[in-house]
Regions:
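Sequence context surrounding c-type heme c attachment/ligation sites in exported
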Residues: 1-68, 73
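Active-site-adjacent structural elements in folded domains
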Residues: 19, 84-86, 99
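Sec/Tat-exported extracytoplasmic proteins
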Residues: 38-41, 89, 107
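Amphipathic alpha-helical scaffolding segments comprising HEAT/armadillo-like alpha-solenoid repeats
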Residues: 76-87, 108-120
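Short inter-helical turns and helix N-cap capping residues of alpha-solenoid HEAT/ARM repeat scaffolds
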Residues: 90-92, 122-124
């Protein structure tokens, strides 16, 4: 893989920070790293290649980017999913706090119990997002 520098100081020869998700590239327009090098291929090729090489991959599972995209478009139907994501201690704190940030784009008032859960979270990033 060709080297790419992230944040000015972090040269890498990998796919970046996440596993390629050609399905999200098609539905949300997210960057698709495989076809940046394999310029003679398209996203459909990438999807088939990942499926063939990694049959047990989680590439078909729901991804938080779908909720974030919906909230960014003002789609209030994402609210319940964002609250569930923010409550899920099994996902990274940055994702949880980002879910809270996206809630501000679409939510009216949240139940005080919801916010108070986040204010007492062990992670400072989550607590900080709850205050904002």
């Amino acid at each position: 893989m060709p080297q790419r520098t992230y944040m000015v100081v972090d040269p890498r020869r990998d796919h970046s920070f996440r596993v390629p998700r050609p399905d999200l590239a098609v539905t949300l327009g997210t960057p698709e790293p495989c076809t940046q090098c394999h310029t003679d291929r398209d996203v459909q090729w990438d999807a088939a290649e990942i499926s063939n090489r990694f049959p047990d991959s989680r590439a078909d599972t729901p991804h938080f980017a779908t909720l974030f995209s919906a909230a960014s478009r003002g789609d209030a139907s994402a609210q319940a999913g964002l609250v569930m994501l923010a409550d899920d201690s099994g996902v990274p704190a940055i994702v949880r706090s980002s879910a809270m940030e996206h809630l501000t784009l679409i939510a009216g008032k949240l139940e005080s119990g919801t916010v108070s859960r986040w204010l007492t979270d062990p992670n400072s990033l989550v607590r900080g997002a709850a205050v904002a």
